[in-house]
Amino acid sequence: MEPIPLSGGQLILTNPDDHTLLARDPSLIGGALAHDLDTLQKMRMTCPEVPAGLSAACPPLPEDRDVPLCERYIRTCRAAFKPFVQEQPAFYYLHGAENFRALRAAVLAMTDLSGAALMAELPVDADGRMEDGTDVLAAVAVLQRIGVSTIILTAEESQDLTDALRIIAPYARVSLGVRCPAVWLLRDIELPNVELFVPLPHERARRLADLVRTRPHGRTVIPREVDDVALVSDGRDAHFIDWTTGISDEIPCDHELDERLIELEDEAPAAFKLLIEEEEDVITLEENLYMITRPVCLCAQSPELLEKALRVYAGLALYDGTWEQEERILKYFTEKYGLICM
């Protein structure tokens, strides 16, 4: 392995007083991150040479988890994020999501409000999964297709961080970064394909800057896989499909959906085609997300219904041309929800 050619590692400043690092080594600083609106203004004054972004904490999930939960939580996120939008930061840093579905919903809420660049913090646990059981590769597959331009990984254990990066690196098509204790760099932690470093809240950028500059040994590069197959997610696990992937017959999203999904578990189709005919079907889909273990092809005659289904489905949906949609609508669904047109 060889050093990453794009960057020797850049740092995000999190304190206006660290602006002297810019004068010392401008190429080391990739941006400035403020934790509130007052700090954002200070960052703009002290660090005008780099983009200044704003940290946005994801709100807690409601105690009532009954469906429809996804759209309710998106509305909660929009209300929490709306005061930030008028300040027009260069980017937002989403963090603190309770699980992957909450993080995805927060991304949708932010892209509803703003076209600014998005960084998303992704906490990883053991065995390449998040605490809620979501495969980190499945999470990255979704985030990089719905508007997130940089994914920042965090972990309680250094080995969990390295393991997650090894899994993600060949398939990530966005910038990868880490937010970890500076001492991990001192111990030469392996950080494949990492280009960005964000200081922990209790640590100053100055110490991290010295380590990024002087201890590059763990920053190796894992070559990207060739895109001869598509990486998709069912909302929990990652799958690889090609354009000849078998898709089931249409499965109505009615009160028997869970039974039908169980019956199909032993059958051949690699993807389930779910039929959305009315708004109640969207609720049924959300109720049964935990039952879905394969890629999903969503079909609906109405683009409005299709969009509602895309908002609640936590994976990357396929579209096979059933009930032809306008090109402009498909383009929007692809950019907003990561829809994959077969």
Give the residues covered by each predicted segment.
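Domain-level signal for soluble alpha/beta catalytic cores
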Residues: 1-342
